[in-house]
Amino acid sequence: MKFLEKLKQAGNSHNSLLCVGLDPDPKLMPVGMTALEFNREIIAATAPFVCGYKINLAFYEALGKQGWEILSETCKLIPPELLSIADAKRGDIGNTSKAYARAVFDELGCDGVTASPYLGYDSLEPFIEYQDKGIFILCRTSNQGSADFQMLKTEYLGQKRFLYEVVADKSLQWNRYENIGLVVGATQQEELKKLRLSYPKMPFLIPGIGAQGGDLKATVENGTNQSGQLALICASRGILYARSGSEFAQGAAEAAKQMRDAINHYRKRF
């Protein structure tokens, strides 16, 4: 199944654009619980309300030698009809990039990955060549320092363009398999709206809701296409740690349902 088709089916199956981040933080998890146990309960509790999960590889790498095993087992827990996105932000050249692609797609079996365009097309090609997998290219990110480079103006095709605009245009040029999307932060509403109008057929992975302060209503209005689709709206801490202690899973389920329903409320305009 092509990635874009699975993305649409995942959203339709649970009537959801919500993508929950699986970022297990030992400081916030229930005392004595392993990351794998935590993820298992989170997935079981939230799966009815989401279109997929975004797995931030850094949280597993930080767990040491057992981290990869926990990561691998976590990926297996995700229901097959839902998306699994490896938030890896990879970007390297040659055999290194090929190895990264094999690790994410062949070993972990993820449906998609986040990647950095800074090294150019040859650093992304090994991912793009997995024609049934999705590649979300960092474009206009949600962090405070993102403007350091992304808002620089450069000469492009005879015009002065922001660097993030060049990234978006290049991403479209590379999208011959229709498996490329953009990472656009919910904290960047002006650019989110502009990019959606310019690229109505590309999926957007949209972090920055919740702890980073992104506005949910504006994100739905600016980040979805004319059919109210093609957006994966990400939330992590606000879902995972909605409650503490033994009620964490129930709290996550309630928070996920509430956010899914809020997103759908704002989608009613479509």
From Swiss-Prot:
A GO molecular function held by the record: orotidine-5'-phosphate decarboxylase activity
GO BP annotation list: 'de novo' pyrimidine nucleobase biosynthetic process; 'de novo' UMP biosynthetic process
Signal peptide per UniProt: none
Active site residues per record: K89 (proton donor)
Presence of the UniProt keyword Ribosomal protein in the record: no
EC id: 4.1.1.23
Enzyme class per UniProt: lyase
Pfam families named in the record: OMPdecase
Pathway membership: Pyrimidine metabolism; UMP biosynthesis via de novo pathway; UMP from orotate: step 2/2
UniProt keywords, alphabetically: Decarboxylase, Lyase, Pyrimidine biosynthesis
SUPFAM superfamilies noted in UniProt: Ribulose-phoshate binding barrel (SSF51366)
Reactions accelerated catalytically: orotidine 5'-phosphate + H(+) = UMP + CO2
Family to which this protein belongs: Belongs to the OMP decarboxylase family. Type 2 subfamily.
Protein's UniProt name: Orotidine 5'-phosphate decarboxylase
Species name: Dehalococcoides mccartyi (strain ATCC BAA-2266 / KCTC 15142 / 195)
Gene: pyrF
